[in-house]
Amino acid sequence: MGETQMTHITIDGKEIEVDSSLTILEAAQKADIKIPTLCYLKEVNEIGACKMCVVEVEGKNHLVTSCNTKVAEGMQIHTKSDKVVRSRRQVLNLLLANHDVRCFSCSKSGDCRLQDLSNEYGITKSCYEGDAAKFAPKKENPFLTYYPELCINCQRCVSTCNKVACNGTLHNEKIGTRTLIDAPFGPDWKETDCESCGNCARVCPTGALVAKNRKKYQVGKVEKVLTTCPHCATGCQYYLVVKDNEIVDVEPANGPSNQNLLCVKGRFGSFNFVHSPERLKYPLIKNKETGEFERATWDEALDLIASKFKEIKKQYGSDALAGFACSRSPNEDCYMLQKMVRCAFGTNNVDNCARVCHSATVAGLAMTLGSGAMTNPISDITHDVDVIMLVGSNPEEAHPVIGMQIRQAVERGTRLIVVDPRDIGLSRSADIHLKLKPGTNVAFANGMMNVIINEGLADEEFIRTRTEGFEELKEIVKEYTPEKVARICHIDPDHLREAALMYAKAKKAPIIYCLGVTEHSTGTEGVMSMSNMAMLVGKLGKS
């Protein structure tokens, strides 16, 4: 990498030295100088559409948009000159001309970027008469509502849908003041590819796109609590927004696995149950005479449970008892459960529902690598890689945020190999789709390794210094020619060869697998085969 070129500029009289690759806006942010924006999203929407970020650069005969203008040596920049302020006030006047300003009835009042800027620049009502057409709200989507009259056409939602979530659902229709976001939240929303992830609503600076489960609040009067999504194992982080001890909203955090993204489950299914009227608020004990559950105290409930456990243990022995934990329970809760079962019950009958899904991974990777866990963080396997091999996994449904990041990778040019009997959503973007006969994952992997070895693509240095048992593996896979594997797996042998060459020749090529590999009678062997394939070409842990 070359040395960073530094540039000297002056912003509002403050001399600073910055990386020459930065924009004026980024340079100002590093210097803690505030420049207002409406449409800007870093690396996603740097189009300068709203013109709120304009600044005055000495020597220029016009204002420039700071979000997409690079710094230059000796630049003298003014962010608050009379000319700049007049321009921003004019922008706000034009935006408010076609904007419904009944803020008190808007769910985003108090958390609206347009409202904040209008108050800051003293523009509460436009001096112009708007000419935009009137459109009815689109409310049929169960999670999201679109209010066209509140839209300022900043394009943040469109860019987020197409470049971040990479779902390609939101588009523009019409032009000029009649430009409208084609949001599929009307009666036909089910017929679109919209995943209702809500990432579009997250970036909306007004109340045009809103989540239906979001309750009205003012930003300065709430508490935000960082936590982890309880649904899948991606580990997305978000903030629960709490007002008067009630959760009113959820905001994504820039966590290592989700990077400000959330899926429909994380955004819309993560907190409503907390205050649900259907939740039990106290213990219930069944009345033997009436057969109905009746309210009890905690002491009564715990005494009953403890006495039953003692009774069973005394009559049938410790092994008549067991503890079974939920995979969504925190590690601390699972630890306390097994402690109680082993110490109080006197048995090792402890289990967790995740064992059925993931014991094959723990056993298989522990045997081949010494650790039963993934070798790289999610950011490694979806960023800056050449090929992704997706085996027995449908992340768009099971782990949607990972699915979004894989779509991002494909948009950036990463090649995709899908190995799955099903026509999953990502197979539409795949360079190769191998539709294996279910249960033939080991044969598939052996066939891949057969081609890799015969083509001389094995990483001999990695094998010699980092592995053992290669000669035995080589002898086993020798029989798994593409033609034999094609008969076992019901695939085209040429497609198998093509996939093997694409995978082996790539510099960085992670393998992402899921329950399609593990939930078989040969699940552990399937995991070991995936691991062997990665070691054969020396791609283990590369990022």
Model-assigned labels for residue ranges:
Residues 15, 169, 237-239:
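Short, surface-exposed charged micro-motifs
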Residues 100, 215-543:
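Catalytic alpha/large subunits of respiratory electron-transfer oxidoreductases
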Residues 14-22:
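Short, contiguous acidic and Ser/Thr-rich linear segments
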Residues 8, 22-26, 70, 330:
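Short, structural beta-strand-to-alpha-helix junction motif
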Residues 4-14:
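Eukaryote-biased recognition of intrinsically disordered, low-complexity regulatory segments
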Residues 34-41, 214, 538-541:
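Active-site phosphate-binding and catalytic loops of NTP-dependent enzymes
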Residues 24-58:
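A basic, amphipathic helix-loop patch mediating RNA/tRNA/ribosome contacts
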Residues 51-197, 202-228, 243-246:
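Fe-S ferredoxin-like electron-transfer domains
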